[in-house]
Structure formats: C-alpha cells, structure tokens
Design a protein with these regions (language model features):
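Polytopic transmembrane helical bundles with strong interfacial aromatic enrichment
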Residues: 1-201
C-alpha cells in the first residue's frame, strides 16, 4: 500500500509540473494561473515531505491530520485553477444564504475530519495496549461521541443545501453527488463500528 501511495504521489507531482509548464501559455490572459500552478507544485513538495514524516513517525495522528488537510488544500487550489481557465458560462443563480451555508458546511466537514483522526488516535492507543478487539470501543472517549454526533450536524447542513438548491432552483447539480458520497461515508462509519473496526485488523 505504501509503495502504491508513493507511486501515485510521484505521478501526481509530475502532472502538476506539466500543468505548470502549460500554464505559461496563459501568461497574457491569466497571469495568476502561473502563480497558482507554482503554488500547487510547492504544496505537492510539502505534501511529499509530510508524507515521509508521517511514515517515519509511525502514523502520528497529528501529522496524519495535517497530511489530510494539506491534501484538501491542494485539491481546492486545483479546482480553482480548473474553474479559472474555463469559460465563464453562468449556469447557476446566486443566493447569499446558500453561499454562507456552503462555507459553514465546508468548515464543519474539516472539523469532522479532525475529530475522525482523533478517534483513530484513541483506537491506536488501545490497540497498542494489547486489549482484545471486542473491547476496543466498549468505553470510548468523548472524541468518539463527538465524531459520531457531529456527522449528524454535517448531514443536516448538507441536507439544507440540497433542499435550498432545489427550492430556489439555483442549478448546483453537484450537490446530488455530495449528498450521495456523504451518505456513503456515514454508512461506512456505521459499518466499521458495528462489524469490524478497523477493517483488516
């Protein structure tokens, strides 16, 4: 798994360097594209170094969290780059309430990722203690309940977005994909808790 992870990371880094090269073709129309492409390359380098420190630290939870957040930042910048080079065809309506709800949903999702990493940290501590798997989550810490309960907050926030998008006919079609993936994510968490947590252990 580690080899595959490094191989994919190397290919992704190469793709970013190629994208930086082609970004110079937009230097007259969109100069910030060069800066953003260069920023992505820097972030990819930082991510590669951070990935090494994660492995060297034997999967330190705090470094894993930073590693994941850095990955999300890279994806966010890449999506912005894709948006900036596309033709600006207005296919959606604007609604201030919806905009701030999206910001709230993003913040809640990042918080949920951090809570999930803390849960994993507590489980790793219990696993290292040598206790049988059956008792790993018999008396979980408060972070576990926070992570579980917070998923409901994230779900209802995105349900609100889904409902407002339909009611106001804003035209954001990707909200359907978000809802599907979110439900799948929650289902996977429930499955891990009630059947075999963590998988492969």
């Amino acid at each position: 798994v580690e080899y595959i992870n490094r191989l994919i990371g190397a290919l992704a880094g190469l793709a970013c360097v190629i994208a930086l090269f082609f970004s110079f073709g937009y230097r007259k129309e969109n100069k910030k594209l060069i800066f953003l492409s260069f920023l992505i390359c820097l972030l990819m380098g930082f991510q590669a170094w951070l990935g090494k420190t994660v492995v060297d630290s034997v999967l330190n939870p705090y470094k894993i969290t930073t590693h994941m957040l850095a990955a999300l930042l890279i994806v966010a910048v890449q999506l912005f780059v894709i948006y900036s080079v596309q033709e600006k065809l207005k296919t959606t309506a604007f609604n201030a309430e919806f905009k701030w709800a999206v910001v709230a949903a993003l913040g809640l999702t990042i918080a949920q990722i951090i809570f999930g990493t803390q849960v994993r940290e507590s489980v790793d501590t219990i696993v290292e203690s040598g206790l049988p798997k059956e008792v790993w989550l018999q008396n979980p810490k408060g972070g576990f309940y926070m992570h579980r309960s917070f998923s409901i907050v994230v779900l209802f926030t995105n349900l609100f977005l889904f409902w407002r998008n339909r009611e106001l006919k804003l035209g954001f079609k990707r909200i359907n994909w978000i809802m599907g993936l979110l439900c799948l994510e929650i289902l996977s968490g429930i499955t891990m808790y009630y059947f075999n947590f963590p998988f492969g252990s």
